[in-house]
Amino acid sequence: MGQKVHPHGLRVGVIKEWDAKWYADKKNFADNLVEDHKIRNFVKKNSYAAGVSRIEIERAAKRIKLNIYTAKPGMIIGKGGQGIESLKNQLQKIVSNKNILINIVEVKRPEADAQLIAENIAQQLEKRIAFRRAMKQSIQRAMKSGVKGIKTACSGRLAGAEIARTEHYNEGTIPLQTLRADIDYGFAEADTTYGKIGVKVWVYKGEVLPARKNINEKEEANA
């Protein structure tokens, strides 16, 4: 049975960038990695209602810059910036002797963001909404927003069934093996009374590299 590689990992260095942008020697690498993990978990847990899509971490000598991509920036920033100051103070306890800079980036189309779609489906499952309805509604909203294709999968004791299973729904195209295809991937878990249900979402937003190819062709023609 074929297993699918993570769409982001496959495309890093081709059309995707790293979520952690820093370099460290052997002595500090593990500490930085654990610190990153703690930061991501804390921000995600603390600002779950704000719809955090992803967190980029950049490091300099004594400085950490966080780029937080969120659907509802106002919920994180708070009234007069109080929320962001509170978040910064709490994060300061996790990272010692380092200055933290927080940059909030708004996700313009949350209905086309794979991570936010997965979390939305998971939240609906926790509210006992039928999984098929939750998946189909998310697919319809994503297709209306202009994506080229979307695929969703729910795994677990669906509708309280005795035997766990996986159900997929998709619309449009999802070229997983095409490296120039901009495929967004999201994963979330729903805690239901019957146990956990895993939600996976793949969103195809179109090809990324053709413009560069056309520029090269024009340069060759001019030469």
UniProtKB/Swiss-Prot annotation:
Q: Which organism is it from?
A: Clostridium botulinum (strain 657 / Type Ba4)
According to its UniProt record, which protein family does this protein belong to?
Answer: Belongs to the universal ribosomal protein uS3 family.
Function comment? Binds the lower part of the 30S subunit head. Binds mRNA in the 70S ribosome, positioning it for translation.
Alphabetical UniProt keywords: Ribonucleoprotein, Ribosomal protein, RNA-binding, rRNA-binding
Classification via InterPro entries = KH_dom, KH_dom-like_a/b, KH_dom_type_2, KH_sf_prok-type, Ribosomal_S3_C_sf, Ribosomal_uS3_bac-typ, Ribosomal_uS3_C, Ribosomal_uS3_CS
Please state every residue range assigned to the domain named KH type-2. Answer: 39-108
Q: Origin, by domain of life?
A: Bacteria
Please give the biological process terms from Gene Ontology that the record holds.
Answer: translation
SUPFAM superfamilies the UniProt entry points to: Prokaryotic type KH domain (KH-domain type II) (SSF54814), Ribosomal protein S3 C-terminal domain (SSF54821)
Give the matching Pfam families.
Answer: KH_2 (PF07650), Ribosomal_S3_C (PF00189)
Provide the protein name: Small ribosomal subunit protein uS3
Q: Where does the signal peptide begin and end? A: none
PROSITE patterns reported in the protein's UniProt record:
KH_TYPE_2, RIBOSOMAL_S3
Q: Which GO terms describe its molecular function?
A: mRNA binding; rRNA binding; structural constituent of ribosome
- What quaternary arrangement does the UniProt entry report? Part of the 30S ribosomal subunit. Forms a tight complex with proteins S10 and S14.
- Gene3D superfamilies recorded: 3.30.300.20, Ribosomal protein S3, C-terminal domain
Q: Which CDD domains match?
A: KH-II_30S_S3 (cd02412)
Which GO cellular component terms, listed alphabetically, does the Swiss-Prot or TrEMBL entry include? cytosolic small ribosomal subunit
